[in-house]
């Protein structure tokens, strides 16, 4: 199923941090919910982080535009609309 394919994506960042990003493909009510599970520092002290991004569907976002402290431009997300 396609939702299983999209539900768990792992990014390897240029700073050699490995994070798992879950639940990021749906833009609902102009918000994109991103749950980030940290494997290594600098996010190790917060193993689970929830972020909400403004979005318009369909589209994409670079997380580094919002949180440059933790991510770089490799952390790019493409998302789709929630079916209503």
Curated annotation (Swiss-Prot):
Belongs to the scoloptoxin-11 family. Contains 2 disulfide bonds. Residues 1-16 form the signal peptide. Inhibits voltage-gated potassium channel currents in DRG neurons. 200 nM of the toxin inhibits current amplitude by only 25% and even at concentrations up to 5 uM, the toxin does not inhibit all potassium currents. In vivo, insects injected with this toxin showed signs of neurotoxicity including twitching, paralysis, and body contraction. Its main location: secreted. It comes from Scolopendra mutilans. One of its GO terms (cellular component) is extracellular region. It comes from the Eukaryota. GO terms for molecular function: potassium channel regulator activity; toxin activity. The keyword Disulfide bond applies. It is found in: Secreted. This is Kappa-scoloptoxin(11)-Ssm3a. Expressed by the venom gland. The keyword Disulfide bond applies. Keywords: Disulfide bond, Ion channel impairing toxin, Neurotoxin, Potassium channel impairing toxin, Secreted, Signal, Toxin, Voltage-gated potassium channel impairing toxin.
């Amino acid at each position: 199923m396609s939702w299983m394919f999209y539900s768990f994506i792992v990014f390897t960042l240029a700073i050699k941090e490995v994070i798992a990003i879950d639940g990021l493909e749906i833009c609902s009510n102009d918000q994109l919910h991103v749950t980030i599970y940290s494997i290594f520092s600098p996010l190790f002290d917060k193993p689970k982080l929830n972020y909400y991004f403004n979005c318009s569907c369909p589209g994409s976002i670079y997380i580094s535009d919002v949180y440059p402290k933790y991510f770089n431009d490799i952390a790019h997300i493409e998302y789709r609309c929630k079916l209503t």
